[in-house]
Structures are given as structure tokens and as C-alpha cells.
């Protein structure tokens, strides 16, 4: 087969395949996972480092659905000051990280409107096993009596929902 004929066949094949490829969508319009969403938002860079250090990336990339109450970098900075730790020391303590991070994850996809609809005060059980409380103003009280406010809500991921919070939640001691 000569070169000109091959070029024509290749062009026709590509033209015939184009509508099929467009119908499939190039994948660019798919929502990211929870980890992908957090990785793409500079407010959550410390959270992403912590999730990675704790070995929870695969879990939070899983099918879910999950709701993550995601502490911002400012929330982590405040916690480090409160505990007198460096970020490196926190990231090295995987048992502590896993305990704290799983306390921020709730099974199911809860939008802010779902949380608002819960009878108040609402006790929300986390995948860590302990619960935190949400009041009528959507303020969260953790297991140690510390309060967090929602900074941003309903960030949608392919496997759940993320709500940014201004405080790292701590589970009950013990």
C-alpha cells in the first residue's frame, strides 16, 4: 500500500473515531477523589501530607462515600502551637495521625444541608468510632470540648463531600 493511501485511510479512521471519543469524554470532566480535591487546594497541603504519612491515601481514594471535615493549614498551625510540636514530629507519629484523621471522616456523603437537617445538637459518629457534636449554627464540638467552625462547605468529590474547618478535631482522650 502506498504512503498516500495509508495517509487517507488513517485520516478517515481518525475522523470516524472522533465522535466516539467525544462521547466518552476525555476524563477531564470527572470529579477528583477526596484526596485529589484536597491536593488541588492549597488550604489543605498539611492535611494531604498528614493523610499520606498516616497511610490513608488509598482509603480516601476509595469508593466511599465519605464526608471529610478537613482542617485547613491554619488549623494545623494552631494545633502544632497548642501541642508544642513541629509539623515533622506530628507527621512522624502515624498512630496519632491515624486516630486524629479518621475522627474527621464520617461514612456517607453529608452535604451542609443534610447536617443542618439533623436534630440539634446532633451527635455525628466518625469512622474512628467516637462522635463529635454539631449545634444549630453548624459549630462542631470535638471529644475534648474544642470548637470548630465550617469555613467552606460542600466541596464535591467523586467519592464524597469535603467541608473545610478552622480547627483540627481531637477525639476524646483515652
Where on the chain are the PLM-derived regions?
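Mature, structured domains of secreted/extracytosolic soluble proteins
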Residues: 3-10, 15, 20-174
Amino acid at each position: 500500500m502506498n504512503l498516500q493511501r495509508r495517509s487517507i485511510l488513517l485520516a478517515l479512521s481518525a475522523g470516524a473515531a472522533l465522535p466516539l471519543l467525544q462521547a466518552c469524554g476525555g476524563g477531564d470532566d470527572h470529579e477528583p477523589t477526596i484526596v485529589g480535591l484536597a491536593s488541588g487546594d492549597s488550604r489543605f497541603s498539611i492535611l494531604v501530607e498528614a493523610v499520606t504519612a498516616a497511610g490513608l491515601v488509598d482509603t480516601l481514594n476509595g469508593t466511599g462515600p465519605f464526608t471529610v471535615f478537613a482542617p485547613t493549614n491554619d488549623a494545623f498551625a494552631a494545633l502544632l502551637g497548642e501541642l508544642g510540636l513541629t509539623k515533622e514530629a506530628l507527621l512522624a507519629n502515624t498512630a496519632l495521625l491515624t486516630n486524629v484523621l479518621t475522627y474527621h471522616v464520617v461514612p456517607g456523603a453529608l452535604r451542609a444541608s443534610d447536617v443542618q437537617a439533623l436534630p440539634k445538637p446532633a451527635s455525628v459518629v466518625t469512622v474512628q468510632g467516637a462522635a463529635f457534636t454539631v449545634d444549630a449554627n453548624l459549630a462542631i464540638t470535638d471529644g475534648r470540648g474544642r470548637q470548630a467552625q465550617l469555613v467552606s462547605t460542600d466541596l464535591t468529590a467523586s467519592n464524597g463531600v469535603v467541608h473545610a474547618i478552622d480547627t483540627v478535631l481531637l477525639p476524646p482522650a483515652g
